[in-house]
Amino acid sequence: MPRPSWQRSSSGAARQPVRVGAVTVTPVVQFHYRVDPLLFFPDLGPLDPDAWYAKPPYCEDGFLVVDIGAFVVRTPSRTLLVDAGVGNGKSRPNACFDRRADGWPVAHDEIDTVVFTHLHVDHVGFATRFDGAAWVPAFPAARYLTTAAELDYWTGSGAAGFRERLGDYVGDSVLPLQAAGVLDVVEPDHQVAEGVRLLPAPGHTPGNVCVEIISEGQRAMFAGDMVHHALQLAFPALSTDFCVHGRCATASREALLRDVADTGTVLFPAHFPDAVPGRVVTDPTGGYRYEPVGAR
């Protein structure tokens, strides 16, 4: 009997805050899951079981270990959310993507800006809540940011098949923001706040962005799904089956890794186990390695 592609592991909550200069980043892990590598990377060959990326916490029993969540970012004057997980009470073909406990370390009305790195189902779910009659913005004081290329693609006919496969998450998690007048379409290099800006990184999706923080001489980068799994550090040319434009995603990922490697920049990948941030270092044998923050 073939093993299931997805295995739910456990739910999560807010993790230990990380300081980047005067900015505090709190990862929020909504849940862990294990996924068949071939679902993400259909052309993937056998993995070296002794390689760092094939061992816990990145892999278990032949499965990739992946988290879903978000990041609360507190600057001296702002409280932002980078991505919004999968949400609660939303009908999805994959039962893992529903009924996920809400564990934000701040009150919903404290968040003034929600930045979407892209509009995939696992990055927008908590953007809205059901008020008994309709889906409404979940963070009442917030503006929500996306790019024109991103919004146009996911609301257009070209993405219809993807929406059908994963449930109409655009209808319950994105369009209500637009209807409420709180969804702002910004440039892919938009300055979000002092020391916080977007950087274009197309490929995984057409309007995909990364989020850069610079504070008191320190730098961090929210990679979204540019690095979905540690495998892509060892093999940067490897794109997932969920990338809209695989070659473009590879080019953006390679540029990102060149930019942050060996610089001390703290990387916040969206789906690494326990949302542990780290630094990217060049591997003399090829590709890159990941040093979780605190490892040195």
Regions found by a protein language model. Give the residues of each.
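Metallo-beta-lactamase
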Residues: 3, 95, 102-106, 110-124, ...
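Conserved beta-strand hairpin/beta-sheet module of binuclear metal-dependent hydrolase folds
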Residues: 14-103, 210-224, 229
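Active-site metal-binding loops of divalent metal-dependent hydrolases
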Residues: 30-31, 84-87, 119, 149-150, ...
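Short, P/G- and charge-enriched loop/turn segments at secondary-structure junctions
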Residues: 56-61, 132-133, 198
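Residue-level marker for buried hydrophobic side chains located in beta-strands
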Residues: 80-82, 115, 144, 220-222, ...
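Metal-dependent catalytic neighborhoods of phosphoester/phosphodiester hydrolases
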Residues: 96-99, 125-134, 279-280
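Cap/insert and terminal regions of metallo-dependent hydrolase folds
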Residues: 217-296
